[in-house]
Amino acid sequence: MIVLVAAGWTIWEHNRDPIAVLDKKPGTIIPIVDSTLISRFLSEEREYRHIKLSTENIDTIEAFISLPLIRYTPIMPVIIVLGGLEIGIHNFRYITEPGNNAIVIYQYPYKTDQWRNNSTLSQIPIVRRKIFEVPAQVLSLSDWIHQQSWSDTSRINVSGYSFGSFFVPAVYHLDNLKEHRLAPGVIAYGGVDIYQLLMTNIKKPSLPLKMLTSWFVATALYPVEPALHLPQMNNEFLIINGTLDDQIPKESWQELHRLVQEPKTIIILEEGHMHPRKPELTLKLVNISKKWLREKKVINP
């Protein structure tokens, strides 16, 4: 009986329209936090803003924004950064020479410390709902940016790194179905096949338990499976992966490369996976991304 239920659930999830799951309307958006400070993370002082946008249907959208103090043009390009799970305002220190560009670091709607303070089992449905809200939150954040006096609305892009790279395909797929307003983007250290990625990264349980856990989570999160969205992205992308990556299997990132339509630029580094303990690699990835985005005239020098 359990096997039949599991099989039926798997078939149902795999036949659901992922867009119907992810295309959530935010409803009314109201700023509830907008604080500003002037600080120097690296070589120059910039204006930093912390914003929270209350929505009716997709929870609170939170982001940190870095703006130049001296603006050489009335409007500027915008990079929306989707980073790792521990992303926050401190990540601005990796973005050297940001130039006359606005950098927006998106904060995920589920904080990792909530895992430590709550029962894992009880949090699964909450995490699932939050993950499904991410693409709609990112596009709603983009809509809010469009309304800001400082944004060049023709040059707003999304750049995803590690954990964040897995949301980029769904974000651009949704954008493509709407008004196709996003500029060319970056997918760094991403891959496809959530099941295989979990099998690679879950270390502790026995093999049967690992397989069961990976199947359950991959099925529950199937609407955000990158392989569903990659062929539907109608844009240009920089794709970066590492040959020494022990978290993203080679077949996973090779399939990602295959599924992304042209035009695309693929860079393969002789590096492992990015991590907060490897700031040099993070800086390298940011600089590669900036160079490509400047060549494509997505951002200012």
PLM region descriptions:
Residues 27-72:
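N-terminal cap/lid segment of alpha/beta-hydrolase-fold proteins
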Residues 63, 74-84:
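Short beta-strand element of the alpha/beta-hydrolase
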Residues 87-97, 101-136, 197-200:
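Cap/lid segment of the alpha/beta-hydrolase catalytic domain
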Residues 122-162:
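Gly/Ser-rich "nucleophile elbow"/oxyanion-hole loop immediately N-terminal to the catalytic nucleophile
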Residues 169-219, 268:
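Hydrolase active-site cap/lid region
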Residues 233, 239-241, 245:
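Short beta-strand/loop motif that positions the catalytic acidic residue
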Residues 235, 249-258:
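Short alpha-helix in the alpha/beta-hydrolase fold that links the catalytic acid
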Residues 269-282:
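Histidine-bearing beta->alpha loop at or near hydrolase active sites
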